[in-house]
Each structure stands twice: as C-alpha cells, then as structure tokens.
C-alpha cells in the first residue's frame, strides 16, 4: 500500500505533466504574453469560484492574516506567468523550460530562511544536478541572453510563490488559496491590459481557436492543476515540489517534438540530461522517505 507521501508525489507528477502543456499552449495561442495570462487567470478564477460555490461555500471566508499571504502569492504568480509566457514568445519553449531547473537550487537556499530550518546538503546537491541535467539537454541553445534573463526572473518569482504556498497549504483550503491567488493575479494582469490600448484590443478580440485553447489552459492546466499543487503541499515541502517540477521540461520537450517536429531536437545529451534529472528527483524522494521513516520510528 503506497504511503501518503508516495500518493501525493504520484499525484504531483501527473500535475507536472499537465503543467508541461502550458508552454505548448502558450506557443500556439496567438495572444501576446500579458493578455494571455490575464485571460488564463480570470477564467481559472471563475472555474474555481464555481466549484467552491457548489461544493464548499464556506471556503470563501478567509482571515485578514491569510489574505495578506494570498495577495503576495497572487502578485508572485501574476508576474511569474507574465514573464514565463513572454520568455516563451521571445526565446522559445525549450530555453524557457530549461531555466526552470534553477528553481530547486534557489529553493534549497531560500526555504531554510523562510521556514527557519537548517540548509540540507543533499537538497543543494540534487538542485545542482538538476541544473546540470538541463544544461546538457539545451547545451546548444544558451546564446539568447535576453530570453534567459527573463526566464530566470520568472523562475525566481516561481520560487517565492511556492514558498508562500508552503505557508498557506496547512492554513487555508487548497481551492480557496487558488481562488484568491488567481483572483488577485487577474486584477494585476487586467490592470496592465486596461492601460495598454494594443493589449486591450488584442484581449477583447479572440479568435475561435484561442478561445478553445484558453479553455483547456484555464480549466485543466490551471484550475485543476493549481488546486492540486496546493493540496499536495500539505505533505510535500516547497523543495520537493520544485525538484519534481524539473520533470516539466522533460515532458514539455517530448510533447514539443510531437507537436512542433524539427523545432525541438532530441540527441544523446538530451537522454543523459534526463537521466541526471531523474536521478535528482528520485534521490530526493528516497531521502525524504527515509527521513520520514526515521521520524516515525
């Protein structure tokens, strides 16, 4: 019988697979980065709001202290996604996904400060291994400095967002966390759109294909995946979440090969990089399970 941690890890791997579709959908949707994120966050907020209204209306009521954390999470996720999709537009799917690998290393450094615990050496080692794996996968694509910088900023924002959710996961129901963070983020992104006539015109004139793709992105890859990712953080640490997210580029590259053909090439370095990332992800899981076993014995 799988342990609670194992079940949550497997569930999160499925969520990461769904996350890997976001870069593909972002490349297919004709909207520019900020209008795309504005629609994504607004639609997902609506979907989650309907779910809460039907299933658990009481989840709408949140304490003032938690509202402040939710606002911070909304700010981080809004700017994380805007910079992420902008990086996809200017630098491509592969380079943007590759920069996500640095998230685990940054989390290994920042989580101890955020949660007032000691730095764990193996987390730094596995975080560095994940970076090495992605460098091998994309060794021929590191000449786009601007795209790299934007993607790096997006990664750091994503780390802070994950740390905030680590605080909220045990305090607030997952659906409520998702509803308020996405809602605050939607206010920020639509505020930017409303003050830019070109973006506003683009956001208000969607083609039918974009409506369909936005529906998939918002309902499946955002509303469901977002709530699920917050829920698993009741058990998984922010670091475990970030190290597992390193599988997103692997899933994303395989999908992009199938969808975009020759735009994304697989070679020996790709497979070697994948093996290193897998070793880091599995190694972290092993040490976390062993640590849990020691604490319970």
Regions found by a protein language model. Give the residues of each.
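Hydrophobic transmembrane alpha-helices of multi-pass small-molecule transport proteins
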Residues: 48, 71, 119-138, 189, ...
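C-terminal transmembrane-helix exit sites in multi-pass transporters
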Residues: 50-52, 103-125, 250-270
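Specific transmembrane alpha-helical segments of multi-pass solute transporters/efflux pumps
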Residues: 55-94, 100, 136, 218-236
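Helix-helix packing/entry segments at the starts of transmembrane helices
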Residues: 96-102, 165-186, 222-258
């Amino acid at each position: 019988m799988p342990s609670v941690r194992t079940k949550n890890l497997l569930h999160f791997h499925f969520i990461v697979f769904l996350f890997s579709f976001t870069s593909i959908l972002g490349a297919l949707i004709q909207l520019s980065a900020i209008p795309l994120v504005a629609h994504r966050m607004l639609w997902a907020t609506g979907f989650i709001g309907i779910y809460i209204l039907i299933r658990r209306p009481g989840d709408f009521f949140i304490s003032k202290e938690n509202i402040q954390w939710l606002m911070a999470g909304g700010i981080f996720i809004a700017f994380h996604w805007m910079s992420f999709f902008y990086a996809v537009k200017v630098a491509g799917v592969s380079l943007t996904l590759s920069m996500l690998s640095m998230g685990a290393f940054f989390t290994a450094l920042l989580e101890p400060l955020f949660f007032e615990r000691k730095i764990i050496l193996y987390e730094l080692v596995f975080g560095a291994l994940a970076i090495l794996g992605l460098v091998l996968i994309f060794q021929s694509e590191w000449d786009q400095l601007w795209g790299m910088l934007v993607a790096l900023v997006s990664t750091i924002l994503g780390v802070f967002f994950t740390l905030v959710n680590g605080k909220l996961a045990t305090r607030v129901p997952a659906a409520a966390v998702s509803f308020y963070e996405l809602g605050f983020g939607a206010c920020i992104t639509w505020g930017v759109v409303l003050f830019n006539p070109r973006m506003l015109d683009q956001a208000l004139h969607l083609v039918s294909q974009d409506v369909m793709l936005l529906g998939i992105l918002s309902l499946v890859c955002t509303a469901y995946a977002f709530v699920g990712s917050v829920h698993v953080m009741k058990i998984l640490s922010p670091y475990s979440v970030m190290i597992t997210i390193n599988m997103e580029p692997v899933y994303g590259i395989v999908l992009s090969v199938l969808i975009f053909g020759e735009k994304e090439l697989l070679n020996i370095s790709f497979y070697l990089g994948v093996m290193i990332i897998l070793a880091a992800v599995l190694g972290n899981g092993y040490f976390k399970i062993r640590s849990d076993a020691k604490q319970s014995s």
